[in-house]
């Protein structure tokens, strides 16, 4: 199978790295020359990579097409492109809905929306997919944990929570800087904080079939440090601000 990517940003790079490290049998991966730095690094990584300077040529030479541009660019370029009737189109574009994708591509079927995140490069993390499809799910199962969604409105909730990626990294950065300012070396501070949150996340995943509230309760002792920390953050409105922000993101997606 030959696959092509319209857009050569960080997500495209992450997805391709995941593909190259997986057991997927892909004969050719075609990318745009638009981001020369990323496309050149990808070409050096594998002989399967072909770099073209024309989006239409990418479409013409691919069985599956992945749309990985910003919404602004998508609205501009998609109506100008001609897709093949037998092509599978998978959009990573956050705010272009299915009705517009169908209009822009002049396709009524074989169009999907997926939400890959950068950890897909190491074949980790959830990949929400709408609508459900056996072949597309099988593809993404090689790259992470596919979560099939039954309707587009529900998928917007996953887009909203995926926006917590940068805030999560900012949390790690803030705590690492705090340790550094207390005299810990930068490398040790970052190693400690990232290792801590990896361990906490893995523990949460193992226990994800249970109510996550139990993890909150079990990580505290009466008058202990964790009890103090979670109570102070609650009083400051830290957790309520998460709900407020995800609601704000959801409102934007529904426009």
Locate each region found by the language model:
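Internal alpha-helical scaffold of NAD(P)-dependent oxidoreductase catalytic cores
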Residues: 100-110, 125-159, 163-207, 248-253
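Rossmann-like NAD(P)(H) cofactor-binding subdomain of soluble oxidoreductases
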Residues: 15-17, 38, 49-129, 133
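NAD(P)+-binding Rossmann beta1-loop-alpha1 motif at the extreme N-terminus of oxidoreductases
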Residues: 1-53, 57, 178-181
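NAD(P)-dependent Rossmann-like dehydrogenase/reductase catalytic/cofactor-binding core
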Residues: 194, 198-255
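Small-residue helix-packing motif on alpha-helices
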Residues: 29, 58, 74, 185-193, ...
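Short, well-ordered alpha-helices that flank and scaffold nucleotide-derived cofactor binding pockets
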Residues: 13, 17-21, 44, 79, ...
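A general structural signal for well-ordered alpha-helical segments in protein cores
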Residues: 12, 39, 62, 74, ...
């Amino acid at each position: 199978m030959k696959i092509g990517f319209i857009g050569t940003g960080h997500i495209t790079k992450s997805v391709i790295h995941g593909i190259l490290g997986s057991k997927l049998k892909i004969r050719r991966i075609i990318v745009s020359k638009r981001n020369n730095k990323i496309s050149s690094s990808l070409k050096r990584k594998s002989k399967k990579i072909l770099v073209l300077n024309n989006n239409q040529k990418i479409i013409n030479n691919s069985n599956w097409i992945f749309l990985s541009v910003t919404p602004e660019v998508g609205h501009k370029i998609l109506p100008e492109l001609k897709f093949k009737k037998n092509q599978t189109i998978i959009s990573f574009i956050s705010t272009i809905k299915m009705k517009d994708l169908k209009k822009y591509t002049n396709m009524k079927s074989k169009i999907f929306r997926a939400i890959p995140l950068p950890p897909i490069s190491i074949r980790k993390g959830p990949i929400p997919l709408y609508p459900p499809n056996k072949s597309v799910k099988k593809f993404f199962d090689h790259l992470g944990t596919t979560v099939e969604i039954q309707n587009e409105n529900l998928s917007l909730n996953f887009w909203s929570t995926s926006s917590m990626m940068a805030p999560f990294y900012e949390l790690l950065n803030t705590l690492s800087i705090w340790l550094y300012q207390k005299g810990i070396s930068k490398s040790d501070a970052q190693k400690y904080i990232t290792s801590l949150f990896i361990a906490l996340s893995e523990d949460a995943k193992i226990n994800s079939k249970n109510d996550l509230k139990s993890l909150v309760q079990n990580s505290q002792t009466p008058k202990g440090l964790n009890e103090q920390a979670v109570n102070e953050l609650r009083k400051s409105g830290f957790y309520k601000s998460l709900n407020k922000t995800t609601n704000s993101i959801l409102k934007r997606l529904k426009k």
